[in-house]
């Protein structure tokens, strides 16, 4: 199974067996994380994998799993989006190996040892004690037509990219993303949170935007679409009442011919 195929079958796992993952598999998982490329390869990140008895977690909505992976990042522009893009690639990879995972957005380590970097996200993982997969019909997602504003041509490339993004997981399944699609680009926005808990929710929204971008980039890699992620000055200069501009995927002409 490929990571692209995993997009259409993966589900969050909240019940795990206590079975050990082999050292060789753990090494592969660690290497995959280190080799993954986000939207900002220049941002310094660090992965840390540990068993549940090695560190104590604090926070809400924690899942009891045999293993956890932590993603740290330097704090800079786009770091949350980049982290979401990286960690979702790892989640899809785990699924292809028969390993379940679940984001722990409300969890923190009781003793955080990386002083110069921010702990962006913790993900629980291990062999599942519940079904690993779900059918396409079981996804509880907003319809594509309610997420996308179409301007101009809308072909197979745009449809495949946006359908993959639509299926991305998000905090509390809020699905904060919205898209504007044209002939040669897709613009990604996220909803502005309400006043209560604004910064926390904004942080989650930006991480989730990275997760959606990950699905589109994985799709492009699998389907041989030629894309480039950019933030366009012409949009950055604008103020939007209800949305925050995340970035744009530029679609090059040869993609439609493949």
Question: Predicted regions span which residues?
Answer:
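Acidic, surface-exposed loops and disordered segments
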Residues: 1-258
